[in-house]
């Protein structure tokens, strides 16, 4: 690496030109940060010294983020005037909003900037607006946002979106996959198709090594009720998941929450390496240790949505010292700043004017916060705005480059092949769960024993066998309905995250999900019917047996589609279960067994019930209208059609029920897809 002075003017401004291995000259400010913006610079690249672990050709496009006067507000929930408790709660929640416009203001004029090689920490007490600002920077909140945000002086756009990585506070990783599988599937879905398989695996290996994930690479990620890797390892896996695609801007929401001090410091060292590779890193942080605090390049302190400090982190204490606001005892700088942001003045010395104001006004917290906001407005904000307007202009080639959308899109079929493998691998433990197998086969054996060698020679025996038919319909309707209704509510957070990152088309996800789940909805009913059919001695006719099995499969698949539709329409585990129970009860009562003669004003319900059509089709497949029974009675033989069990059913035909079930199976899935599309588009993590 060659370093040389460029011009006298540059020398005066402490600017150096750095020549990398690619021979391009780069202007950079001569400061400790790996990347700093230079008002005289027209070309920027990455210093080899800071990317020793990341190949230069894989370095991300530098992004200079500037944000000015950012405001965000949300509409207040209108409590019912009839409910006194809700009205009181609403008033308490919205007391901070003096504007009578029906909105609560979360962010109130945030200004700042950051660039490649820097870690910007957003710090403040809980509820101050840190995460909200982070989501706005990541393009995840767009409604009711005011102010100006630019990326290399270009507003947010879909092309910018592809260059942003977002690590949520809760690690959103599929729990049943191993760390290596998680990264591998992400690589094959997100990396360009121009990269070979060997290159993708090499990149995975490099990231696993750099983030210290070698020991847990073949361990399940875990989460919830699934045992897996530790919290620190899971957080590093989340970061690896994002930097796999070389994001230019990496946003992290509380990455150290839940970690001990050592793990948190180690994680921040990793983020320093990520930043030195040419990325812009922004993280929210609640209360870092003093060691971690000094690892930040820039700091934005937020108090009740207002900025209280913005600048270099190491200069924050000097700034407040200039205001004569000092800790009276040895104190962690982060703890001191958080006390200021919340208005706490214990063990903090204040200037005389503040002490006088405190004496005159009993609310000392408000006095301090108001003072900090005023000083920020007069001392810091004008300088930052002037720098952004005059000197911090992104080079033209970076402005052009960021508007080029990264062509990472695989074909629909390629996405389907990759995602179907991942879906099956994630859910295969549920598909072949021992309890599920015992339940299905155990119930089949019990039913076979209860209806052992059942007959249709008398009305009573026929009624018993028809009851078995209806129970089979109930069993596989409920099993398939409840097996599918929770799929999308459970996977909502994973789907929202991956859709925000544009990993795949929603249609690919839905088709993979429904086809992979169909494995269980086909295998278990098939084995179930093989056991019950021959133990109960149904019609011993091969075509009849095959059509009976196919009918049960059609009922199960239609029930699966209905469950997916109900789950996608609410995306809530609790509400999905309640709605599914109600629908199952209605379909069960109108299925044609308990009530054959439904009142006319209620008959419309049975036409919505796939159990009604499935039960009728099952009877038509199993029995023939001219089949004889009661031959030993005084009146002689009768046809099955004359039985009271079939008063409302014509045992001939069956095509109508078949087509209706097929239409329902397809229609429910179509409705589920569009409901899922609408719901996911408005969901936020």
Swiss-Prot record:
The record ties this protein, via InterPro entries, to: AAA+_ATPase, ABC2_TM, ABC_transporter-like_ATP-bd, ABCG_dom, ABCG_transporters, P-loop_NTPase
State which residue ranges cross the membrane: 432-452, 468-488, 518-538, 542-562, 576-596, 648-668
Q: Which Pfam families match?
A: ABC2_membrane (PF01061), ABC2_membrane_7 (PF19055), ABC_tran (PF00005)
Q: Does the keyword Cell membrane apply?
A: yes
Q: How does it sit in the membrane?
A: Multi-pass membrane protein
For the ABC transporter domain, which residue ranges apply?
65-329
Indicate whether tRNA-binding appears among the record's keywords: no
Instruction: Identify the domain of life.
Output: Eukaryota
**Per the UniProt entry, what is one GO biological process?**
pollen development
Phenotype seen when the gene is deleted: Drastic decrease in seed production. Severely reduced fertility, with most siliques failing to produce seeds by self-fertilization and mature anthers failing to release pollen grains characterized by the absence of an exine wall on microspores, due to an impaired sporopollenin deposition. Aberrant structures in tapetal cells such as accumulation of numerous vesicles and granules probably containing polyketides precursors in tapetal cells. Abnormal pollen grains germinating in the anther before anthesis.
List of residues binding ATP: 124-131
Keywords per UniProt: ATP-binding, Cell membrane, Endoplasmic reticulum, Membrane, Nucleotide-binding, Transmembrane, Transmembrane helix, Transport
Checking PROSITE patterns in the record gives:
ABC_TRANSPORTER_2
| Principal location listed in the UniProt entry | membrane
Domain ABC transmembrane type-2 positions:
414-623
Localization, per the record, is: Cell membrane; Endoplasmic reticulum membrane
Cysteine disulfide partners in this protein? none
Please tell me one Gene Ontology term that the record gives under cellular component: plasma membrane
User: What family, per the record?
Assistant: Belongs to the ABC transporter superfamily. ABCG family. Eye pigment precursor importer (TC 3.A.1.204) subfamily.
Alphabetical list of PANTHER family matching this protein = ABC TRANSPORTER G FAMILY MEMBER 26 (PTHR48041:SF135), ABC TRANSPORTER G FAMILY MEMBER 28 (PTHR48041)
Q: What does this protein do?
A: Mediates the transport of sporopollenin precursors (e.g. polyketides) across the tapetum plasma membrane into the anther locule for polymerization on developing microspore walls, thus being required for male fertility and pollen exine formation and patterning prior to tapetum programmed cell death.
Q: Please report the name of this protein according to its UniProt entry.
A: ABC transporter G family member 26
Q: Which organism is it from?
A: Arabidopsis thaliana (Mouse-ear cress)
Provide the organism lineage as a comma list: Eukaryota, Viridiplantae, Streptophyta, Embryophyta, Tracheophyta
């Amino acid at each position: 690496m060659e370093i040389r002075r460029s011009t006298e003017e540059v020398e005066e401004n402490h600017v150096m030109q750095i020549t990398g291995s690619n021979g391009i000259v780069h202007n950079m400010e001569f400061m400790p940060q790996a990347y700093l913006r230079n008002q005289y610079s027209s070309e920027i690249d990455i210093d080899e010294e800071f990317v020793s672990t990341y190949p230069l050709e894989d370095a991300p496009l530098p992004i200079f983020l500037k944000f000015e006067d950012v405001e965000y507000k949300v509409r207040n929930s209108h409590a019912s005037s009839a409910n006194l408790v809700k009205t009181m709660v609403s008033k308490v929640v919205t007391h901070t909003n003096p504007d009578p416009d029906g909105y609560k203001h979360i962010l109130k004029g945030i200004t700042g900037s950051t660039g490649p090689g820097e870690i910007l920490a957003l710090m403040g007490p809980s509820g101050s607006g840190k995460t909200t600002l982070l989501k706005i920077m990541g393009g995840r909140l767009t409604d009711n946002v005011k102010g100006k945000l630019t990326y290399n002086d270009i507003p947010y756009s879909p092309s910018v979106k592809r260059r942003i990585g977002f690590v949520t506070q809760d690690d959103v990783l599929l729990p049943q996959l191993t760390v290596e599988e998680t990264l591998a599937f992400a690589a094959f879905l997100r990396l360009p198709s121009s990269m070979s398989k060997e290159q993708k695996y090499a990149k995975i290996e490099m990231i696993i090594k750099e983030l210290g994930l070698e020991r847990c690479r073949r361990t399940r990620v875990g989460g919830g009720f699934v045992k897996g890797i530790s919290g620190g390892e899971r957080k590093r896996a989340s970061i690896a998941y994002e930097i796999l695609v070389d994001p230019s801007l990496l946003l992290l929401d509380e990455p150290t929450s839940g970690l001990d001090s050592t793990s948190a410091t180690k994680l921040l060292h990793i983020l320093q390496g990520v930043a030195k590779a040419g990325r812009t890193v922004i993280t929210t942080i609640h209360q870092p240790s003093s060691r971690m605090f000094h690892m930040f390049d820039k700091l934005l302190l937020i108090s009740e949505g207002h900025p209280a400090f913005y600048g270099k982190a190491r200069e924050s204490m000097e700034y407040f010292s200039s205001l004569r606001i000092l800790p009276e005892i040895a104190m962690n700088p982060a703890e001191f700043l958080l006390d200021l942001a919340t208005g706490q003045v214990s063990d903090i010395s204040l200037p005389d004017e503040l002490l006088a104001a405190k004496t005159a006004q009993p609310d000392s917290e408000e006095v301090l916060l108001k003072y900090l906001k005023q000083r920020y407005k007069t001392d810091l904000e004008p300088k930052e705005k002037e720098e952004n307007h005059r000197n911090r202009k992104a080079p033209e080639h970076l402005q052009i480059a960021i508007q080029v959308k990264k062509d990472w899109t695989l074909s629909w079929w390629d996405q389907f092949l990759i995602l179907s493998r991942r879906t099956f691998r994630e859910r295969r433990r549920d598909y072949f769960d021992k309890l599920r197998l015992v339940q299905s086969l155990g119930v089949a054996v019990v039913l076979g024993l209860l209806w052992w060698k059942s007959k249709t020679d008398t009305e009573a025996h026929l009624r018993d066998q028809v009851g078995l038919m209806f129970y089979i319909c109930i069993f596989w309707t409920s099993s398939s309905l409840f097996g599918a209704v929770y799929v999308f509510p459970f996977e909502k957070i994973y789907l929202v995250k991956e859709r925000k990152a544009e990993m795949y088309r929603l249609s690919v996800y839905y088709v993979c999900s429904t086809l992979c789940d169909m494995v269980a909805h086909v295998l278990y009913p098939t084995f179930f019917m093989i056991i019950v059919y021959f133990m109960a001695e149904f019609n011993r006719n091969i075509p009849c047996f095959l059509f009976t099995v196919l009918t049960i499969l059609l009922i199960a698949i239609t029930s699966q589609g209905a469950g997916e539709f109900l789950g996608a329409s609410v995306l809530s585990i609790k509400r999905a279960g309640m709605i599914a129970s109600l629908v199952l009860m209605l379909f069960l009562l109108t299925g044609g067994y308990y009530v054959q003669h439904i009142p006319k004003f209620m008959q419309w319900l049975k036409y919505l019930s796939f159990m009604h059509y499935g039960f009728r089709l099952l009877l038509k497949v199993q029995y023939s209208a001219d089949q004889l029974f009661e031959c030993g009675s005084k009146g002689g033989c009768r046809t099955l059609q004359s039985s009271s069990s079939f008063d409302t059913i014509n045992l001939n035909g069956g095509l109508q029920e078949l087509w209706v079930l097929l239409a329902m199976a397809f229609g429910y899935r179509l409705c589920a897809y569009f409901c899922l599309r609408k719901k996911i588009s408005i969901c936020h993590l």
